[in-house]
Amino acid sequence: TEFFSWRISMTILGGICLFCAFGFLKLLPNSRNFIAQQGLSFKFHLHAWYAHLSHIRLLKIYGIGFLLTSVFVTLFNYVTFRLFAAPYHLSQTQISLIFLSYSLGIISSSIAGNIADRIGKKQMMILGFSCMLLGVLLTLSASLFLIILGIGCVTTGFFIAHAIASSRVGELATSSKGHATSLYLLFYYLGSSIVGAYGGNIWQSHGWNGIVILNIFLILIALIVIFSIKPLHSPSVTH
């Protein structure tokens, strides 16, 4: 929107989305193992969701998903306001380029599984949140370089922890895996919606230091939850 109206920008984005959707439709291979189930009642869905929510290890993973997006979205939502203001006065285009740090997620999430096979998934999630904690602390600096480096660390840690947490859902749920995954995504987006919005109050009242304190608090809660997760020894959810 720095060079065009918001209408033109949205039209361009819409066109890109349509192009990607068409490519997805044409290039995605057919499912090999999917078997459609007929006659599933609403009661069945409620029972499946309740069973997953009643399982403490799955519930902790859902909480981790909530905390992940809470930190990630809150940081990205309000760091833009900080960089628009003095002493940085970055333009919309310059700030948008910082979001290229998302590409770090392609690398970190790809290698997370291989490293987790060697050191363990619990340790990998701890590593991911520790990386996020380091990144959040780096954004306290007045140096633009360190702020951007901090954003990169948060992004890397986020995708590491998310890749491991989401894979744990499939491992812990031995049946109705689609229901288990849908609950993870529900908590995942609730974090970005609730805490991401609440962060605006923190930003207005306490500035960037308040955002940092909020994110540190959330990361510490996540680490406590991760440490409390017991190893998987037996099937977790049965119907």
Label for each model-derived stretch:
Residues 25-51, 237-239:
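Flexible cytoplasmic inter-helical loops of multi-pass small-molecule transporters
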Residues 54-75, 152-156:
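Pair of pore-lining "gating" transmembrane helices in MFS-fold secondary transporters
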Residues 86-104, 179-183, 213:
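Loop-to-transmembrane helix entry
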Residues 9, 14-36, 225-229:
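C-terminal membrane-cytosol helix-exit motif in multi-pass small-molecule transporters
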Residues 2-15, 199-219:
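A membrane-interface helix-boundary motif in multi-pass transporters
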Residues 107-120, 203-204:
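Helix-to-loop junctions at the C-terminal end of transmembrane segments
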